[in-house]
Every structure is written in structure tokens, then in C-alpha cells.
């Protein structure tokens, strides 16, 4: 199935694109999406994605359809869902 991922900040700068699509098997988890992103954009490894665990490095996280933030990478996105790869930013 095809999942669209929109990038903001560093992910957008490293990838050179605003968004991309990745192909994953039905029933795939966000971790599978992360692995697909790492394969497509090796520059994500290190700063954005831990190359050993395929966890997103803090402060990065996924938002689903601009409505929901999954608590773990075991969330199974559905066909056609749009993932936003965001980062937590604090200021004063």
C-alpha cells in the first residue's frame, strides 16, 4: 500500500522535497514506514532515524492526517493516510 509522508524542517531540508510516498505491505507499522524512509533517504540515518533500532530520534514524531499522534511505532497506518513527520519545538 502507498503512504504519503509530508516533511517539515530538517527532514524537508535533507530530502530536498516537501513530501514523498513510500510503498509498504498491508498491515505494516510506522516502523516499516521509517525503514522505507531510511532506504529512500539515507541522509535521515543518524540525525532523524536511529540506524540500529529504526526509532525516530527525539524530537521527531509522526502525526496522522493532522489529527492524531500515535504513541508508538507499532501503529498501523491505513492506505491513503497522510503522515506528517514533525518535530517538537519549544520557545519562550
What are these regions (language model features)?
Residues 1-91:
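Ubiquitin-like/PB1-type beta-grasp interaction modules and other compact soluble beta-rich domains
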Amino acid at each position: 500500500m502507498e503512504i504519503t509522508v509530508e516533511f517539515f524542517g530538517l527532514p524537508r531540508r535533507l530530502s530536498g522535497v516537501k513530501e514523498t510516498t513510500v510503498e509498504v505491505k498491508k498491515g505494516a507499522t510506522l516502523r516499516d514506514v521509517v525503514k522505507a524512509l531510511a532506504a529512500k533517504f539515507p541522509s535521515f540515518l543518524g540525525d532523524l532515524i536511529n540506524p540500529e533500532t529504526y526509532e525516530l530520534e527525539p524530537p521527531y514524531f509522526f502525526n496522522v492526517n493532522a489529527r492524531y499522534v500515535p504513541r508508538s511505532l507499532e501503529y498501523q497506518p491505513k492506505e491513503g493516510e497522510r503522515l506528517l513527520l514533525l518535530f517538537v519545538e519549544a520557545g519562550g
